[in-house]
A protein has these predicted regions:
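Mixed-charge interfacial surface used for oligomerization/domain docking
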Residues: 1-145
């Protein structure tokens, strides 16, 4: 019962720096993928109320998307910048990007300093997103429909 009551409070935010697998999977057209790659577009996505992956924002450059994902955490984390709950980062063959997100999160959320855990994305999810994907998970506001 607790899980059912709280499952929508887990925030899932993702970005990808490589659109190749999105093109191969049919989620992005070849033309859009080519243009997106040329412009260094990194989509910012999240899991909605129904558990579906939703594109939220198209951000230019890796540096800016790392800042954008951290801003989402500031906006949605339980207790804002005073958040002291669990924080996980997963990545698909981009450890340095995951570490950059962790470093930024730890610098802005003082209670998390040294407590952000980084893991690899599993093969099932990784086969859909490909390399260059970073996911940020934390406890926050309930996801609405």
């Amino acid at each position: 019962q607790w899980v059912e009551e709280n499952k929508r409070k887990v925030q899932h935010w993702f970005f990808s720096t490589d659109l190749t697998f999105y093109i191969k999977g049919g989620r992005v057209t070849k033309t859009a993928g080519f243009v997106g790659t040329m412009l260094s577009i990194c989509p910012l996505l999240h899991v909605n109320y129904e558990g579906k992956l939703i594109p939220v924002q198209k951000v230019r450059t890796k540096k800016k998307v790392i800042e954008a994902i951290e801003k989402k955490m500031e906006e949605l984390a339980e207790n804002g910048l005073a958040y002291d709950g669990k924080c996980y980062i997963s990545h698909s063959a981009c450890q340095a990007d995951a570490e950059a997100v962790a470093s930024l999160v730890e610098s802005r959320f003082p209670n998390l300093n040294g407590r952000v855990l980084i893991n690899s994305i599993g093969t099932t999810i990784g086969s859909h997103t490909g390399p260059g994907t970073v996911a940020l998970f934390f406890w926050g506001e309930e996801r609405k429909s």
